[in-house]
Amino acid sequence: MARHSELVKIPRLDRYVSKLALGSAPLGGLFSEVTDLEAEETILAAVNSGINFFDTAPLYGHGNAEKRLGAALNKSQKPYVISTKVGRVLKKFTPEEVAGKVDGLAAYVGVDPTIFPVFDFSKAGILKSLEDSLQRLNISSIDIALIHDADDQIDQAIAESYPVLDDLRSQGIIKGIGVGMNFCSYATKAVKQMDLDIILIAGRFTLLDQSAQDELFKEC
């Protein structure tokens, strides 16, 4: 077995995932346009190489990445684990209303210019985000829900987002809870104050920046 496809267990989920996951931000058209066929071929190539763990979010392509990921995995007919994210809800705006909004809009190419992601860490926002993701992915349940980019709103995420996710986990509606963060200090606070199954930290464990190893990993 190739190292990228070696499996590790996420304990409470009782699921084994490949050590290497496929992130789907580029499949949503991050910085350059991606066709449905290109996205499908990429996802199926990952599946055929032994990868079974796929990460997505409503932000990625403003829903396009989730739609493409769900369609391709449905074609593959192989078992998989999906993590998607909560904390943003996609809303419809007029072009005039969208003008001046910057949260990810300029980064994604080929998206509907009237659909825009809006931060919402409230209970209602979390439930709406999950409901919409289930529809876009065309699946009946979510393996892992990650609270997304709550670095500047970590207190609200702890007080409002986490309790509803914990309740859904206890009901079996979602299997695992995590955070997808950008800064170690906020992720560390999340680890200390929430009962999490998994942590995604962006850009803090690379060749250039290994701050997660010194700060966050010690708490995991």
Predicted regions and their residues:
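Short glycine/proline- and acidic residue-enriched helix-loop micro-motifs
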Residues: Y108-F119
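Active-site beta-loop-alpha junctions enriched in small/polar residues
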Residues: A25-L27, A57-L59, K85-V89, I147-A150, ...
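Beta/alpha (TIM)-barrel catalytic core signal, keyed to glycine-rich beta->alpha loops juxtaposed to Asp/Glu
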Residues: H4-L7, A150-C220
